[in-house]
Regions:
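Catalytic machinery of carbohydrate-active enzymes
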Residues: 1-339
Length: 339
């Protein structure tokens, strides 16, 4: 009888993308297994693009919400589904409470927030041995970290052509001209955001060559995207806050080149196999790089970076302000030539 596995997923979009190689490895180790994902509503579309996932179940809890009684009740309901194993990917105590409530015999995950009494297949994370987040996830497919070969596949999403065409029609877009996609937001803070004026300068160059420039992001990113558009003579298409996540994924898959900050959309673009230039400032690609053979990372590698701060502690954000559009354009052109 095939194994049935429940995954309690991370919340952040980028982290969700990086879990896909785990599911592929589970299928390799347990042929014919069934994998269901228990995921927040805002990230469900990510798992729906993964052929390894059988079913996506909505996790109703937001960031920081405890709601202990509700967690226990939902865990008990999940336990009726006949799972053989639950793998808890977040390191939080509250995520493991749900796993305990399910009564599933094998409850797998890292120690995290001292979860010794909640999980019974508990792993101690050797961060030095597994610096990449994707490998930390994939290693959980194996009985021990020592059994993991140290290699994870890259995420790779599926796209439904009809769904993509519907998204294009809904937003009045066409693919008759090459598309440059900008993802100018970064949820963590301004120290991860390349300046609007740099995005705009790069956009103007591509617009002059007959390209389209589409701007992607949430409603929170609308203001910076609008600034980029205004600095580009209003010739860009600002999609920030106008698409839901499934539409954003479909439309991003149309892009010929993507330029973005270290963000969830960066990981989506990588999983969609787009030519991708990832701009790094306060963060580091050593832990969560774009997982794609078509990605180039651009960073000044200043002595003060990565600082991992939301805002520049020195007040200048030179790591991004001094990273010129020329550098990013050169990386994009190198990708185009290698295609």
């Amino acid at each position: 009888m095939s194994k049935k596995i429940l995954i309690i997923t991370p919340s952040w979009i980028g982290d969700c993308v990086m879990t896909q190689p785990l599911y592929r490895r589970l299928h390799e180790l347990h042929p014919g297994c069934t994998i269901d994902a228990f995921a927040p509503k805002w990230s469900m579309a990510v798992f729906e693009r993964m052929p390894e996932i059988n079913r996506v179940i909505e996790n109703p809890f937001g960031h920081g919400a405890l709601e202990l009684k509700k967690r226990w009740r939902i865990g008990r309901e999940l336990g009726k589904e006949g799972y053989d194993q639950v793998i808890v990917l977040p390191g939080s105590l509250k995520s493991a409470i749900i796993a305990l409530a399910t009564g599933i015999k094998q409850r797998t995950g890292y120690v995290g927030e001292s979860r010794y009494f909640l999980l019974n297949d508990i792993r101690k994370l050797d961060k030095a041995a597994l610096p990449l987040m994707v490998d930390r996830y994939t290693a959980l497919a194996h009985p021990t970290q020592a059994d993991f070969n140290g290699h994870s596949d890259n995420p790779c999403f599926t796209i439904d052509p009809e769904s993509r065409q519907a998204a294009l029609a809904k937003h009045g877009l066409a693919t008759d001209k090459p598309i440059l996609a900008f993802c100018p937001g970064a949820e963590y803070g301004p120290a991860k955001r390349w300046p609007a004026r740099h995005f705009a300068e790069l956009g103007r160059r591509y617009l002059a060559e007959g390209w389209q420039v589409w701007l992607f992001g949430s409603q929170k990113d609308f203001e910076i995207a609008d600034e980029i558009n205004q600095l580009s003579d209003g010739l860009c298409t600002n999609l920030c806050g106008k698409t839901n996540l499934p539409e954003a994924i479909d439309l991003l898959s149309c892009a010929d080149t993507v330029v973005c900050n270290d963000s969830g959309l960066m990981h989506l673009a990588a999983a969609l196999d787009r030519k991708l230039v990832a701009v790094y400032g306060s963060s580091s690609p050593d832990h969560t790089p774009p997982l794609s053979q078509k990605a180039k990372i651009v960073s000044l590698n200043l002595d003060c970076s990565p600082c991992f701060k939301r805002e520049c502690p020195l007040g200048h954000t030179d790591c991004l302000n001094k990273l010129t559009p020329d550098r990013v354009q050169k990386a994009a052109e190198e990708l185009a030539r290698s295609a």
